[in-house]
């Protein structure tokens, strides 16, 4: 075999491994009946870590953005998320990591399947059904991408 054949085989194997590893952060979508009604008040609202734990424990369908005030990308992203939440009349929550204790941050980082298995930063958006991760957005995306994230997955208000 030629050197290029070995390189090609190596690249294909790496892509397969990356695909397998990256798919472990979310639950199989075919198991979930869409659209889901998100719990909570319409718009973008900060929740405490205790409120987050309660939503997980109750098996609620909810979207939580993990952000921090001092994050430049969060400062750009959060107004877009708020705009989409208000326009589509859906409930979106967020946890500001600057407002939780170190112990709560540690619990959040180690008990949430996505955060435990993946490197993450802020903003991170998680669509959750109890403790199951339905989908996620890692980092800043534009408004159209946020709208696409919700499309056909959530009940839009009227």
Task: Label the model's feature ranges.
Residues 1-42:
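N-terminal targeting signals for export/organelle localization
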Residues 44, 69, 73-76, 117, ...:
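Extracytoplasmic/periplasmic, Sec-exported soluble proteins
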Residues 51-91:
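Local sequence-structure signature of Cys/Sec-based thiol-disulfide redox active-site neighborhoods
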Residues 43-46, 90-108:
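Thiol-based oxidoreductase modules, predominantly thioredoxin-like and allied folds used
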Residues 101-121:
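Short Fe-S-cluster ligation motifs
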Residues 69-73, 98-102, 132-134, 142:
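Solvent-exposed loop/turn segments at secondary-structure junctions
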Residues 63-65, 92-95, 124-127:
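Structural recognition of the beta-strand scaffold that forms the well-ordered cores
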Residues 119-158:
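Non-catalytic, surface beta->alpha helical segment in thiol-disulfide oxidoreductase systems
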């Amino acid at each position: 075999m030629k050197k290029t054949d070995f390189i090609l085989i190596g690249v294909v194997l790496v892509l397969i491994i990356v695909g397998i590893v990256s798919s472990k952060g979310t639950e199989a979508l075919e198991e979930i009946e869409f659209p889901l009604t998100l719990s909570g008040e319409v718009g973008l609202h900060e929740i405490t870590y205790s409120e987050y734990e309660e939503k997980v424990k109750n098996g609620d369908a909810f979207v939580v953005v993990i952000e921090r005030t001092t994050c430049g990308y969060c400062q750009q992203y959060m107004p877009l998320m708020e705009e989409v939440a208000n326009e589509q009349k859906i409930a979106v929550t967020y946890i500001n990591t600057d407002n939780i204790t170190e112990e709560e941050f540690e619990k959040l980082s180690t008990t949430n399947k996505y955060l435990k298995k993946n490197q993450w930063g802020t903003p991170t958006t998680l669509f959750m059904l109890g403790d199951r991760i339905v989908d996620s957005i890692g980092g800043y995306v534009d408004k159209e991408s946020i709208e696409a994230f919700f499309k056909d997955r959530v009940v839009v208000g009227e």
